[in-house]
């Protein structure tokens, strides 16, 4: 018999279906990626540390030139809180946006993915905390498509089905989960990391190393 026959290792299912477009200059494909997911009026979610960099204005200008008007939301904290998401939802709904571009590091990814997830939900955000079968209570038709454009190497949130948001009611970090929170397309353009401050490059590099050690 196999030495693994009596093993206590649990069986599990794994899936990594995200389409990843990797390579220098791939950011030029952003508009096409959005259109391929059915977006016509996306909201770009980023963070205050990135919003004023040329990469954001260049991406918005390229989208506009491609006939894809793109608004920007960046009013989020380094560790996103529930009220950040609520503000983003207000912008999303008032602008009738039909998809979300998450552009930046982990905070932008978590906030933007949650905004896309909550777009058409009727329950409150933390009703979908990753406990039991909470995720099954979400309306899958109320989740908007997501294109992820990571600018750091640390979090890996661009290929994840979950986000971490701080619940201000009890000051705890909570994980929200749904299979459709996974971005439809990821654009991994290493040139976008060049314009980041050295400190962020170092911090996120250590984050990536910590993930490997884990």
Predicted regions and their residues:
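N-terminal small/polar loop signature for handling phosphorylated ligands or for N-terminal nucleophile
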Residues: 51-125
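Conserved beta-strand elements of the Class I
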Residues: 43-44, 99-101, 147
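A glycine/threonine-rich phosphate-anchoring loop and its flanking beta-alpha core
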Residues: 120-214
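A generic local structural motif
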Residues: 6-8, 28-32, 86-89, 131-135, ...
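Conserved active-site and cofactor/substrate-binding residues in soluble primary-metabolism enzymes
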Residues: 22-25, 29, 37, 54, ...
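An N-terminal, well-structured beta->alpha segment
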Residues: 1-73
């Amino acid at each position: 018999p196999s030495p693994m026959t009596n093993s206590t290792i649990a069986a599990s299912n794994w899936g990594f279906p995200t389409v990843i477009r990797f390579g220098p200059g791939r950011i030029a494909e952003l508009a096409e990626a959005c259109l391929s997911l059915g977006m016509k009026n996306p909201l770009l979610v980023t963070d205050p540390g990135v919003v004023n960099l040329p990469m954001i204005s260049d991406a918005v200008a390229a989208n506009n030139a491609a006939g894809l008007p793109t608004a920007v939301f960046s009013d989020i904290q380094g560790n996103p809180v529930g009220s950040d998401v609520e503000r983003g939802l207000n912008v999303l709904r008032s602008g009738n946006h039909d998809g979300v571009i998450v552009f930046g590091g982990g905070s932008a990814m978590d906030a933007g993915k949650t905004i896309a997830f909550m777009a058409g939900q009727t329950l409150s955000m933390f009703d979908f905390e990753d406990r039991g079968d909470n995720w099954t209570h979400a309306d899958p038709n109320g989740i908007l498509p997501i294109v992820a454009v990571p600018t750091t190497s640390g979090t890996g949130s661009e290929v994840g089905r979950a986000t971490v948001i701080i619940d201000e009611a009890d000051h705890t970090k909570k994980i929200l989960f749904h299979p459709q929170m996974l971005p439809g397309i990821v654009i991994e353009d290493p040139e976008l990391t060049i314009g980041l401050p050295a400190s962020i490059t170092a911090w996120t590099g250590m984050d990536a190393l910590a993930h490997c050690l884990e």
